[in-house]
C-alpha cells in the first residue's frame, strides 16, 4: 500500500488513540519531544533567558504581562522577544527561563490543547490545562538540572467558576494556584512588591492592565535583566487579558498611553522628592 500511495499517512496517524498529543509523540516519535534531548554533564550552553512575567485577576478575568528583554549572562540578547502567548481561546501562558526551550514548550502546549479539543470535541477544563502543562514541565527536568530550566506562569478564565485563575510552577512540574496576583522570573521579587501595593479587589480590566505595567516598571527599575517600556524604540510590554470574551492582546496604542501616564506620574514624584531633599539638606560648607 505504501508503494502504491507514497503520500499516504502512516497507520499511526489514522488510528484513534489518546487525546494527548504529547503521549502520541512519546509513543511514535519521542525524538521530537524537548525532553528527549540530553546534554553531557555540565555542558549547558549559554542561552538567552526570558525574565519577568506578571499576572493579576480582575472582576471577570485575568491579565498577564511580560517584558520584552532576553539576556545571555550580562548581555542583552534580545530587546523585542515576546513571552506571553494565548494557550487557547480562554487561557494564556507567560514564559521565564531558557527562552528557546520555553518557546518550544509553549508551541507544544498549544498543540496539546488543540489536539485534545479535536479528539474529545470539547475544551479541556482550566485545571486540566494546568495539569497538562505541569506534566510537560516535569518532562524537562533532566535539562533543568543542567541549567536549562523553564518556569511558566499560566492563567485563564474558568468557564465553570466564571472567574480568572493563576497557576505557577517549579522546575519539577509542581503546580500551585495563586490568589489574586503573582510574578515569576528574575524581576519577580520587585514585581510582587508592586502587585501587593497596587492590586485591590474589584479592579476592572483597564485598572488591572495599569497595575501589571506598573509592576513591570518596578521590576525593570531594580533588575537589569528586565526591560522596561522603551519609548524611543516604541517597545512596549506584551499584555493580554483573558475573560469570558476570550484572549485579547492589548494594542500598542493603548499601552503607550498607559506607559505615558505612569511615566509622567513617576516623574512628578521624583522631582517632588528631589525638591524636598534639596531643601532639607542645606549647604554644609
Swiss-Prot record:
Keywords of the record, alphabetical order, are: Autocatalytic cleavage, Cytoplasm, Hydrolase, Protease, Proteasome, Threonine protease, Zymogen
- Please give the residues making up the propeptide in this record: 1-50
- Gene3D superfamilies, sorted: Glutamine Phosphoribosylpyrophosphate, subunit 1, domain 1
Q: How is its activity regulated?
A: The formation of the proteasomal ATPase ARC-20S proteasome complex, likely via the docking of the C-termini of ARC into the intersubunit pockets in the alpha-rings, may trigger opening of the gate for substrate entry. Interconversion between the open-gate and close-gate conformations leads to a dynamic regulation of the 20S proteasome proteolysis activity.
Where is the region Disordered? Answer: 266-285
Q: Which GO terms describe its biological process?
A: modification-dependent protein catabolic process; proteasomal protein catabolic process
Catalyses which reaction(s): Cleavage of peptide bonds with very broad specificity
Q: Which CDD domains match?
A: proteasome_protease_HslV
* Major enzyme class: hydrolase
Output a single Gene Ontology CC term carried by this record: proteasome core complex, beta-subunit complex
The UniProt GO MF terms for this protein read:
threonine-type endopeptidase activity
Listed pathway(s): Protein degradation; proteasomal Pup-dependent pathway
Note one Pfam family from the annotation. Proteasome
- Where is this gene product found? Cytoplasm
- Classification via HAMAP family: Proteasome_B_B
For this chain, the family text in UniProt reads: Belongs to the peptidase T1B family.
Q: Which NCBIfam families match?
A: 20S_bact_beta
Q: What is the official name of this protein in its record?
A: Proteasome subunit beta
Q: Which organism is it from?
A: Sanguibacter keddieii (strain ATCC 51767 / DSM 10542 / NCFB 3025 / ST-74)
The taxonomic lineage of its organism, from the top, reads: Bacteria, Bacillati, Actinomycetota, Actinomycetes, Micrococcales
